[in-house]
Amino acid sequence: MKYCLSIFLSAAILFYSCSHNKYAVTNKTYKQQIKQYSKLLLEYPMKDSAGLPYAADWAGTTNLSMRRPNFVIIHHTAQNSCEQTLQTFTLPRTQVSSHYVICRDGTVQHMLNDLLRAHHAGVSKWGNTTDLNSSSIGIELDNNGFESFSETQINSLLILLDRLKKAYLIPTSNFIGHGDIAPTRKNDPNWRFPWKMLAEKAFGYWFDDATNVELPANFDHLQALRIVGYDLKDTNAAIVGFKRHWLQDTTRGLNAEQLKVLYQL
């Protein structure tokens, strides 16, 4: 009798735990996908149709590690709530995701292991890197795209960025926005985002007072944008992306003072 009661209580606890996690179904799908990828990692040599003359005796190296992310891409969700964003990121048909979502109240939702590839960057480019999804961590901030970011939300972001930078040795220059890597189609995080505050903590670069800066006569602003990292397929979009990030300005064109800022960067 006691044994049956114990089984019943265990089953009840398990049912209660699952039934009270609103994401239990999608969490199960997540774990199933991880198992499938784990099987691929254990496959030696890789099964393919190349017809390679593989050695009869497989020799596996003892020197290996997991690939680590080298960029952090910051987004705003452009949705009305964290709940709406989490729903979007758990629907297979949307094909979009992010490693982290930070809600307005500072709550952090870690949706995907840092070492796995999220679908957050899309078609993008930064410097010579064209597949940002494969080399970055995506962080979505709960924000409708027009409002300011809450203090508690930014505090959580700073704590997270500090952990990521230390864990993966991410270079200071590689903390950027979605609007930087895809300026023709994205504008996030919006111009209210506190990039200067992040730069003061070594999550990105900033500029000094440009009052006494003198531009060289041969200064090429397009070449400078390219050096910073922008894709110049659409120069107007690249300029707006640069101004949004460093000048909190979304207008086109560059005046003399703005060129000085670009020169410093």
Regions found by a protein language model. Give the residues of each.
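Active-site-adjacent loop/helix surface patches within enzyme catalytic domains
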Residues: 26-170
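Juxtamembrane/interface motifs at transmembrane-helix termini
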Residues: 6, 130-132, 258-259
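Bacterial Sec-dependent N-terminal signal peptides
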Residues: 1-25
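Basic/polar, cationic surfaces and motifs that engage anionic cell-wall
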Residues: 18-32, 150-233, 237-265
